């Protein structure tokens, strides 16, 4: 077993967060569907930044080469679940925090070696 941790911080005013093409590069399946259902550009920007930070934190924690399309972040009532290649990774815990300027995502877990 191996303890893993990944963290990512994103500034809200990043220009690419306003770009639907960037959203299509980062988001998949349910994430993309949810994104396009949001009404305001502020909500879209916040959601995209959140998922982007989460996926970056997952990639850093696992230290493996995955694309954004390989990772799905699913928010449930009690937590955010991480799916890797459509398989739930129960060993990872994801936390996210917001300020007026930044979003930070942190992932920790105790996993079997994935190499």
UniProtKB/Swiss-Prot annotation:
The keyword rRNA-binding does not apply. Mg(2+) binds at residues 8, 56. Keywords: Cytoplasm, Fatty acid biosynthesis, Fatty acid metabolism, Lipid biosynthesis, Lipid metabolism, Magnesium, Metal-binding, Transferase. One of its GO terms (molecular function) is magnesium ion binding. One of its GO terms (cellular component) is cytoplasm. Its EC number is 2.7.8.7. Its cofactor is Mg(2+). It is found in: Cytoplasm. One of its GO terms (biological process) is fatty acid biosynthetic process. It catalyses: apo-[ACP] + CoA = holo-[ACP] + adenosine 3',5'-bisphosphate + H(+). InterPro entries: 4-PPantetheinyl_Trfase_dom, 4-PPantetheinyl_Trfase_dom_sf, ACPS. NCBIfam families: PRK14658.1. Belongs to the P-Pant transferase superfamily. AcpS family. Transfers the 4'-phosphopantetheine moiety from coenzyme A to a Ser of acyl-carrier-protein. This is Holo-[acyl-carrier-protein] synthase. It comes from Ureaplasma parvum serovar 3 (strain ATCC 700970). The lineage of its organism: Bacteria, Bacillati, Mycoplasmatota, Mycoplasmoidales, Mycoplasmoidaceae.
């Amino acid at each position: 077993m191996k303890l893993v941790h990944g963290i990512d911080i994103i500034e809200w005013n990043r220009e690419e967060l306003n770009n639907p093409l960037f959203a299509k590069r980062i988001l998949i399946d349910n994430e993309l569907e949810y994104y396009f259902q949001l009404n305001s550009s502020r909500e879209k920007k916040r959601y995209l930044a959140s998922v982007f930070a989460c996926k970056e934190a997952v990639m850093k924690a696992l230290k493996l080469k995955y694309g954004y399309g390989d990772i799905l972040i699913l928010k449930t009532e009690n937590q955010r679940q991480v799916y890797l290649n459509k398989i739930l990774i129960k060993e990872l815990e994801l936390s996210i925090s917001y300020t007026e300027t930044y979003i930070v995502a942190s992932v920790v877990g105790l996993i079997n070696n994935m190499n």
